[in-house]
Regions:
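Charge-rich, low-aromatic oligomerization/scaffolding segments with amphipathic character
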Residues: 100-104, 200-202, 325
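Short alpha-helical scaffolding segments that buttress acidic/His motifs in well-ordered protein cores
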Residues: 51, 101, 105, 109, ...
């Protein structure tokens, strides 16, 4: 059944998207903000990540304890996350509590307190998370891969930030980040659940409509300009020795595409056929099932405002690192030489089309889907057009997508774990 959500834009630039779903007496609220780690100051990596952790820890009129008690008393939830280009406040509640929880979400978005004590506590928590990642081969392989792939491009910076950057952040940095990024023109409020769509629009207008946009925005949504990333011209292998670990992790890949790229759907079908879901696909069938070399292996297409990475990840024993990399090389070389089979593409398209309803089974999932649709300007009928877009993909288009991105001679390969790269010949 088509979603057919209601979309309006308030006079101050806030976008409101509502979708009624009366199957259960519950509501999901998602407040998307077009800002994130990409906007971190150069010497304050982690500002968006720390802001997300502190944002719901008190507002001008509510303490952190008062917020927690209010949510607990209603059986509701509220959380804040930060990505590279977007932050989001996500809340769930019963229908009867919608007005109160939406009011809380608006208060968190508009009037965070940024208490010094909360900042200190959340800073230490975030640093602990980063330290834990530094002890994880998977995280370290990805970090090394991204740094080598992007060099001095902004995408080389970690979304979570660095210990040094986070330690340097002070209250005024968070206040400045919030004032600059949390403008009504950057806000999208999505409500999905047991509410009438007109009532949602009225409620959001009441709580967000008096928020004055910054001078110069004129109610126009902010654009996100990301420079092109230079694709590596030769292959590079990076090793992160972690000799106390039992498993090595491999990150292998290339500079990918923007979400706005006309080849996005073809790339998605290609990625699925190659091995998006770990079990199945060329990579999984060969490296994991037939050869039994990998604990996991999958491919990933991360297309956003800029050219995110196209990556292949694998977890292996140290003894199988070189064999696994060689197998990935061989699989990509074979793909570039012979292409996919018609069966592979048909099965991938069938799976992708069949998974659309499953991806929209919950209010929260629908809200997240609609936020993506709004963020990238895909159109409120995208759920209706998507099956046709996927169905129109052909073997030739998937093969062309592979040839455009995948070249083992230009791959960046990073390995973290109990393994040392062999000395150059």
């Amino acid at each position: 059944m088509p979603l057919n959500p209601r979309r309006i834009v308030l006079d101050n630039g806030v976008t409101v998207i509502a979708k009624s779903n009366h199957t259960t007496p519950a509501v999901s609220i998602l407040v998307g903000v077009t800002t994130g780690a990409y906007s971190d100051p150069p010497d304050r990596d982690g500002t968006a990540a720390l802001c997300a952790r502190v944002l719901d820890r008190g507002t001008v009129t509510r303490s952190a304890d008062a917020i927690a008690d209010d949510l607990d008393g209603r059986g509701a939830s509220l959380s804040v996350v930060a990505g590279r280009h977007q932050m989001a406040i996500a809340a769930t509640c019963l229908t009867d509590d919608f007005d109160a929880v939406l009011s809380l979400a608006a208060d968190v978005a508009r009037h965070p307190r940024f208490d010094d004590d909360e900042i200190a506590t959340r800073r230490e928590s975030l640093i602990t998370t980063i330290r834990q990642e530094e002890d994880d081969p998977g995280s370290m392989a990805v970090d090394a891969f991204i740094r080598a792939l992007y060099g001095d491009h902004p995408y080389s910076r970690k979304v979570r930030g660095t210990v040094a950057g986070i330690e340097a952040i002070r209250r005024q940095d968070l206040v400045r980040f919030h004032q600059k990024g949390f403008d009504p023109t950057a806000i999208t409020v999505i409500v999905v659940g047991d509410m009438e769509e007109e009532a949602v629009s009225a409620a959001v207008s009441k709580l967000f409509g008096d928020w004055a946009p910054s001078a110069g925005t004129a109610g126009v949504k902010p654009g996100v300009a990301v420079p092109d990333a230079s694709a590596p011209v030769q292959r590079r292998l990076v090793s992160v020795p972690m000799m106390n670990k039992s498993q090595a992790d491999v990150a292998y890949g290339f500079v990918g595409i923007r979400r706005s790229d006309p080849d996005y759907t073809a790339m998605s079908v290609m990625n699925n056929a190659l091995g998006q879901y770990a079990i199945g696909g060329r990579l999984g069938d060969n490296i994991r099932e037939r050869q039994g070399m990998a604990y996991y292996v999958f491919s990933s297409l991360d297309a956003t405002f800029g050219q995110g990475p196209f990556s292949i990840r694998a977890g292996v024993s140290a003894a199988n690192v070189e064999k696994t990399i060689a197998s990935i090389d061989a699989e990509l070389t074979s793909l570039l030489d012979k292409g996919f089979t018609e069966q592979e593409i048909d099965e991938s398209k069938s799976y992708m089309i069949g998974s659309i309803p499953r991806q929209l089974e919950t209010n929260a999932a629908i809200a997240a889907f609609l936020l993506t649709v709004e963020t990238f300007g895909l159109g409120m009928d995208y759920d209706q057009r998507l099956p046709g877009l996927i169905g129109a993909m052909t073997r030739d288009k998937a093969d062309a997508a592979a040839r455009r991105l995948l070249d083992p001679a230009r791959a960046i390969v990073a390995v973290a774990g109990p393994w040392n790269a062999p000395a150059p010949a």
